[in-house]
Amino acid sequence: MRMPKLMLAACAVGSLSLAGATLAPLPRAACAQQPRVSYAEDIAPILKGWCVSCHQPGGQGFEASGLDLTSYDAMMKGTKFGPMIIAGQPDSSNLIVLIEGRAQLRMPYGHKALPACLRQNIWTWIFEGAKNN
């Protein structure tokens, strides 16, 4: 039953115009293969550079979905439609579904897709348990 909620969230977010949002450039070593992925060192910088401009209180993505990506705890609360991350299950996590474009829309909405290596880092972090490390 996650997909109907996800589709509702996607439709809500998809109706927004995010033309004014800016994306940060990739950190120089952002795509280096990591033996373990850290939230603080690897995931938080991706979210800050690509997602937080919309997914923070007052942002368009937050207003549409309730998803706050400004901190680990806020992110793990999920959206008003349900959880975004299922620790240990990246392919069942709505965050992965959205950044991979497997829903009706892809995140970041209205912008270039996250580079594959950054998507892989997020996938690996969730697979490793989505720890606040």
Regions found by a protein language model. Give the residues of each.
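Bacterial N-terminal signal peptides
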Residues: A9-A21
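Aromatic- and Gly/Pro-enriched helix-to-coil junctions and flexible linker segments
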Residues: L23-N133
